[in-house]
Amino acid sequence: ASRYEGPVPMRDVIRKTYFPNLDLAAAGIVLAEFEHETPRALHERREPMFFKRLGLAIDQVEADYDIVVIDCPPQLGFLTMSALIAATTVLITVIPSMLDIASMNQFLQMTAGLLNVVASYGASLEYDNLKFLITRFEPSDGPQAQMAGFLRALFAEQVMTNTFLKSTAVSDAGLTQQTLYEVDRSEFNRNTYDRAVESINQVSSELE
C-alpha cells in the first residue's frame, strides 16, 4: 500500500487472524523495496513524500479500527521514520539495564535529529502520548529493580505502571511461533504461565 509503483488498497493488504477483532497487515521482505526505492523517489521529488505514505495508507481504513499498532524494528530507516510520522502515540520498550538504557538514549538522540530534518519538510510531529514500557523485567533482580526505579524517577508518568515480565513461558511459546494465548496451559509450569499471562493482560489493559 505504500509502494511507489502500483500500490494496492490497504484493505487488500489486511488479513483476518484467529483472534476476534484483530487483523494483520503482515510485514516482510517486500518492505525492503520501500527502503531501496525511497532515495530514488526523493531524488525525483515524487509526491507524496515518503514520510506521508504510511499515514495515507492507514487513513484508508482508519474508520474500521479503534487502534492501529505499528511494530518498528530498532533501526532508523525510512519505514521507521514513516511510522513515527504516522503515529499519534509512541510506545518505547526498554529493558531495565544500564547498557540497554544507554543504547536507548543514543538511539533516541539520533531519532530526534532525523525527525527534526523530516519536520523541516513539513512533517507533523505531534503525539497524544509518549510512553515507556519496561520489558523483560525480573522483579527479583536487584539491579533491574534499581534501574526501573531510576526510569520512573526520570520519566515519571511517562513510564507505564505495569511491566512486561521476562518469562520462559513466552520464549517457549515462541519456539512454536505461538503466543501464550494459543498454547496449551498444561504444557507449562502453571505458576509460570499464569504470571506471564497476567503480566501481558495488565500491560494490554493499561494500553487500552
Task: List the predicted regions and their residue ranges.
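P-loop NTP-binding core
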Residues: 1-208
